[in-house]
From Swiss-Prot:
Changing C23A: Localizes mainly in the periplasmic fraction and not in the membrane fraction. Does not affect ferric-anguibactin uptake. A lipid is attached at C23 (N-palmitoyl cysteine). The keyword Ion transport applies. Residues 57-322 form the Fe/B12 periplasmic-binding domain. Its main location: membrane. It is a lipid-anchor. Part of an iron transport system composed of the outer membrane receptor FatA, the periplasmic binding protein FatB and the inner membrane proteins FatC and FatD. This is Ferric-anguibactin-binding protein FatB. It is found in: Cell inner membrane. Residues 1-22 form the signal peptide. Disruption phenotype: Mutants are unable to grow under iron-limiting conditions.
Length: 322
């Protein structure tokens, strides 16, 4: 009797702590299988996924997926942990969430050991789709990391809706979609009235790559309304290598810089003060104080989730502020 009373008391205390620390990561717990009255069918680019039970042990193989689950308050059983953005840092060192390896190459042995009942993956893991599907229902996030021109934001919103249905979080999912719409409307209203042209470039160990309309960051131009300073850049995951002369000739009004090296090394590497390049300093962007060092975690590690999209939009807005 004493032991039972003690357990109840401990449970009440733990419950209170969780309430007070609402930012704690959601960790999957072993629960009774919950069959669905009607199976959920998710159509995606790699096929069709049928979900017959409410998932309770979810494996997330990408930081975008971790953010979706976090925003929908869905517990996570396992995730890749090699590059965790600052806004998901609470998950990195949580021992009850299994480390499934690297984003680019998850550890299949650890995924098997986890025994997930749902796997969330992206095009980076397309080659593992068949194998993963034999282990558990596997949903492919149809985002295009090479060319986001077209339906980037719509794909994000649809994925939120799909996950809301899978986890019985439909109302919260609709709320998150409304938040995305409001943020997109905010930046579109701003860019529609402005004539400034911008370049999006990535810094990597002293070199630069540029991203155009049909690139990884194409949605910045075709959805969010930023006017490109150059249309000569082809579709690419890592951008087209460019020189300082290219940036100088494009002469953007706004220059957005993604510091990939900062992500890889875990600390900022460059800033405007230390970017001692005379050609860059001749651009309108430099002269007018419109060189924006964006949130590299949001732009490079993610950029296709709820939180990261909001951060990307906030970074874009900075380029139009006085």
């Amino acid at each position: 009797m004493f032991k039972s009373t003690l357990n109840i008391a401990v449970a009440i205390v733990c419950s209170s702590l969780v309430t007070l620390t609402g930012c704690e990561p959601k960790v999957a717990q072993s629960q009774v299988i919950q069959p669905l009255e009607t199976p959920i069918v998710i159509e995606h680019n790699l096929g069709q996924t049928v979900i017959s039970n409410r998932p309770q042990r979810v494996a997330a193989l990408d930081m975008n997926e971790v953010d979706f689950l976090d925003q929908l308050n869905v517990p996570i059983a396992g995730m890749v942990k090699d590059f965790v953005p600052h806004f998901l840092e609470k998950y990195k060192n949580t021992p009850d969430i299994s480390d499934l390896g690297a984003i680019v190459q998850p550890n299949m042995e650890k995924i098997y050991a986890l025994k997930p009942d749902l796997v969330l993956m992206t095009p980076l893991h397309a080659n593992q789709y068949e194998e993963l599907s034999k282990l558990a229902p596997t949903v492919h996030f149809d985002i295009d990391f090479r060319n986001s021109h077209g339906h980037h934001v719509d794909i994000i919103k649809q994925h939120v809706i799909d996950l809301g249905e899978i986890f019985n979080k439909q109302t919260l999912a609709q709320k998150k979609v409304a938040e995305i719409d409001a943020k997109v409307d905010e930046v579109q209203a701003l860019t529609a009235e402005r004539s400034e042209k911008a370049l999006v470039v990535m810094h990597n160990n002293g070199s630069f790559s540029s991203f155009g309309i049909e690139s990884r960051y194409g949605f910045v131009f075709d959805v969010l309304g930023v006017k490109p300073a150059s249309t000569e850049i082809a579709a690419s995951l890592h951008g087209q290598p460019i020189s300082s002369e290219f940036i100088n000739q494009a002469n953007p009004d706004i220059l957005y810089i993604i510091d990939r090296t900062a992500v890889m090394e875990g600390k900022p590497v460059i800033d405007a003060e230390h970017l001692a390049n005379p050609l860059l300093r001749q651009t309108k962007a430099w002269k007018n104080g419109k060189v924006i060092f964006v949130d590299a975690d949001a732009w490079y590690i993610t950029s296709a989730s709820i939180t990261s999209l909001k951060i990307v939009i906030d970074d874009i807005i900075k380029g139009y502020q006085s």
